[in-house]
Amino acid sequence: MTLRLKGNQAERYAEAFLAGHRLVLVQRNYRCRFGEIDLIMRDGETLVFVEVRMRTNRNFGDAGSSITLSKQRKVVRAARHYLLSLRTEPCCRFDAVLLSGNEGRDIEWIRNAFDVNYS
């Protein structure tokens, strides 16, 4: 399986997991010149920008360690770009869904994984 297919599969797992926790999909793979957001979900009135990471082995660290400060900045910039297209600015947060283990079936959801102030 190619890296892109694995990434798409991880995003589908994450989306299904979050939907099971009553989050509603707004958009997948939002892309702009500043970066990409894997999933944009709605949790009640809060808009949630989700970074999805998958690691099947820990030779290069766990899935969470790959969300570097540089990556956080790109996600925040892309989120700001997305928000410009809305009529109102909702409450927002940045979550991470980390998949690990065999086939990435072990899921960890980190709410407020990073903050705009640190990016």
UniProtKB/Swiss-Prot annotation:
CDD domains: PoNe_Nuclease. Transmembrane segments: none annotated. Pfam families: UPF0102. GO terms for molecular function: nucleic acid binding. PANTHER family: UPF0102 PROTEIN YRAN (PTHR34039:SF1). Belongs to the UPF0102 family. This is UPF0102 protein Nmul_A0195. It comes from Nitrosospira multiformis (strain ATCC 25196 / NCIMB 11849 / C 71).
